[in-house]
Amino acid sequence: MRASQYLIATQKETPADAEVISHKLMLRAGLIRKMASGLYNWLPLGLRVLRKVENIVRQEMDKSGAQEVLMPVVQPAEIWQESGRWQQYGPELLRINDRHDRAFCLGPTHEEVITDLIRNEVKSYKQLPLNFYQIQTKFRDEVRPRFGVMRAREFLMKDAYSFHISQESLQETYDVMHRTYCNIFDRIGLQYRPVLADTGSIGGSASHEFHVLADSGEDDIAFSSDSDFAANVELAEALAPAKQTPGSSGAEEKHTPSQKSIEEVAAFLSVTPAQTLKTLIVLGETEDEGPAPLVALVLRGDHSLNDIKVSKLEGVADPLTFAPEERIKNELGAEVGSLGPIGLKITVIADRAAAACADFVCGANKTDYHLINANWDKEASYSRVEDLRNVVVGDPSPCGKGTIEIKRGIEVGHIFQLGTKYSAAMKATVLDENGKDVTMTMGCYGIGVSRIVASAIEQNHDDNGIIWPDAIAPFQLAIVPINMHKSDAVKEACETLYDQCQTAGIDVLLMDEPKARLGAMLADVELVGIPHRVVIGDRGLEQGNIEYKGRRDAESQEVAAASLFEFLREKIAP
């Protein structure tokens, strides 16, 4: 490609509304332009990157045996009502009516569409298993789109759906998809972690997310220092520590006026937050129309409550709901900041770490008073012990190897074992070997294609711009001439190299704009992130050398002009 015939819309200034580095650089490098909140135009440079990611995804999905289909973005309300998600999905589902006042939605996902398709096309267990995928535009009406294409309302996604006669068959395909995703991210050149995850609104049983590790990530990923274990913090198990041995003779009540938070109480009593317990009051489950019972959750003061874990506990309302402060004071006799597991007449669930504490500080269930040197089975008691908290750095890994480390991650892929959540609701059945109707078991597998582009930038950039992994760079090589339109020798050398690269299948950009300054061209090449570049000028040609620099290299090097093409062919991965 010749720069003189190509739109390279770079900018010197960073747009004020761009928050994360990928958003800033995608705008400055001329990859995207904002059209409206959460909606972006992809410019030629950006689209080249997007298509390269898409091609890698397609190639690996085809290798896995999945079959490509294409389903409509606009979906009829009936199939969403049939699955039960028309109301469940909430305002993120953009609902529209056509001229005949028939209800539709813009698809944020395609479980209903594919289930409707396959229940009408597949009739026998002999046709299974089957796995279908598409690379299609999705729309989710995010309440606050941000971070550019990282969290846009419209985005490009690869979604796949598999159908099975048994759980064993689903597990086989699930494992194939796990390996396929690893192959995809390896080929793109990303540092990533597959992690155990929650199934969320999609539903189902087993689930793994694939996270690109980056400081700007929205999710905390817990992983072992000595094994492959990794999980979203919301799902990582916090093991029980060794029980502490009480050393005091008995608890003592202390007046703690106006000390509400753990930090305030700990400082006032000259202890660390780890030596305190906090008691949180939530609503329990109820089967009648009366008020839900109160449930006390007790954690160590320096630990944070894990909403996902707690909402799955027997006896606790789902979704997790904190009790009103007025009700707490009326029924338990103390304000929130002074509560403790002391003589409570309600269910008390202690976290594993809290249950192992001794000589701790806790609320005395008397406003503005706390106990010091309290102990279980003496002053305090609990109904049962559960895992209630988020893991922290240094915790023992639940796999039994190493300790927990935590990094931020950007979710770029997610695989689910759906089971029969959708197939049962939509009566997607096949005849088994005995001629009986059996509900198909399903899996689904998503990759954020456009999000991968932003994630790659978050992981690969410097002060000068983007540093693309070779596999998805818009161009692999930039030829930067000095006075090409004034020197026949420079022009001939540039054109010869350009032709050689095109013949060899190397994506090459010739910076042939007649009025472009050398400094501006080099700055654009670095900003756009082209992995390899050469500078060709009269002086170098006279000496028989060409200047080469890799985007990740600190310094340039001289390469013999006669062997330049062979040098580049070895440098640039096919």
Curated annotation (Swiss-Prot):
Gene Ontology molecular function: aminoacyl-tRNA deacylase activity; ATP binding; proline-tRNA ligase activity
EC top class, as a word: ligase
Q: Name one Pfam family in it.
A: HGTP_anticodon
Q: Which domain of life is it from?
A: Bacteria
Gene Ontology CC, one term: cytosol
Reaction(s) this enzyme catalyzes, per UniProt? tRNA(Pro) + L-proline + ATP = L-prolyl-tRNA(Pro) + AMP + diphosphate
Q: Does the keyword Ligase apply?
A: yes
Protein keywords: Aminoacyl-tRNA synthetase, ATP-binding, Cytoplasm, Ligase, Nucleotide-binding, Protein biosynthesis
Q: Which family does it belong to?
A: Belongs to the class-II aminoacyl-tRNA synthetase family. ProS type 1 subfamily.
Task: Describe the task this protein carries out.
Answer: Catalyzes the attachment of proline to tRNA(Pro) in a two-step reaction: proline is first activated by ATP to form Pro-AMP and then transferred to the acceptor end of tRNA(Pro). As ProRS can inadvertently accommodate and process non-cognate amino acids such as alanine and cysteine, to avoid such errors it has two additional distinct editing activities against alanine. One activity is designated as 'pretransfer' editing and involves the tRNA(Pro)-independent hydrolysis of activated Ala-AMP.
* NCBIfam families in the record: PRK09194.1 (NF006625), proS_fam_II (TIGR00409)
Q: Which PANTHER family match?
A: MITOCHONDRIAL RIBOSOME PROTEIN L39/PROLYL-TRNA LIGASE FAMILY MEMBER, PROLINE--TRNA LIGASE
The protein, known as: Proline--tRNA ligase
